């Protein structure tokens, strides 16, 4: 690991804790806002991680103040009250009805998706082909997993993303000096060669397999439409393996007693090609456009689609990957299911050697390449190192950098 990378607290070397020990660990966390030294932060992060109970475990103790490892910097928190909801910008809602039966409707849909991807980087879709009862059962499956008995759930707590197809954790990484998010997550690796269903918990196994199949098919359709919007043949993005890597994330955001002090998910952009998100009625998702935070409202039956960093890179900035976040809320739990299409990093030969750069058909004298070609390994390594600074996540890959 490069020396410049932040410290990562890994949990899979810690022991499981009995309930009484878990309660003691929870009490060890400091619940008063204060500036933490690195040593204090490290100690409190370790105490939190060792419980394997996540944010839900903290809430279940009956807290009225959040632990200080969750309190974000004032410069970030100030923006919550300043920008929330104060914009006339509306995220497009695109109806996919008639997509496969009417060529004229398909052309209109392609045009709308292309425009939304260029201007907003986000759009919502309705009549997308995933039945409402399947969506409802997927949300319920995420809820059941996170709300099941702690002793069962704790067995899946891990940060070993290289050797497990299913795991649960709280926060992707725990880093001294970086505020934790008010969120727990179950992660499922659902690549093109599907894992053994027996690796998934009983409480959500069947719906995980069913929903992921629906979303995989929808992803292939969206990559077709995005290819056409770029003036390419429909299977161009699929042939670039944009749909090979698939991860399903079941986020659980407990009610927060002090939502003004933390975030459900901090500001970030997605690293892969495309994300398909299902959010519940609580809402809280915001995207950053024209230096304003714009609410992405809950629409019954709709799915939120967003362009991710690699798709911006290979389209040479034609499509935009924009930063977004999720606000914490006194109401909860909020549940969302994100399916990220990204790089399938592992092949039979090891790490994929494939280079990704601007698509040749999109390059001309008038539109020269903005980005250098980059390997999968370098993209992941460099982007992770840039994860917690304020510069663009794609800036290291620009040719003029």
Swiss-Prot record:
SUPFAM superfamilies: Clavaminate synthase-like
Cofactor binding annotation: Binds 1 Fe(2+) ion per subunit.
Pathway note: Alkaloid biosynthesis; vindoline biosynthesis
Keywords: Alkaloid metabolism, Cytoplasm, Dioxygenase, Iron, Metal-binding, Nucleus, Oxidoreductase, Vitamin C
Domain of life: Eukaryota
Biological process annotations from GO: alkaloid metabolic process; coumarin biosynthetic process; response to molecule of fungal origin
InterPro entries: DIOX_N, IPNS-like_FE2OG_OXY, IPNS-like_sf, Oxoglu/Fe-dep_dioxygenase_dom
Localization of this protein: Cytoplasm; Nucleus
Reaction(s) the record says it catalyses: deacetoxyvindoline + 2-oxoglutarate + O2 = 4-O-deacetylvindoline + succinate + CO2
Induction text: By light.
Cofactor: Fe cation; L-ascorbate
Tissues and organs where the protein is expressed, per its UniProt entry: Highest levels in leaves, lower levels in stems and fruits. Not expressed in flowers and roots.
Enzyme Commission number(s) of this protein: 1.14.11.20
Stretches assigned to the Fe2OG dioxygenase domain: 242-345
Subunit structure, as described in the record: Monomer.
Functional description taken from the UniProt entry: Catalyzes the C4-hydroxylation of desacetoxyvindoline.
Protein name (database record): Deacetoxyvindoline 4-hydroxylase
Organism: Catharanthus roseus
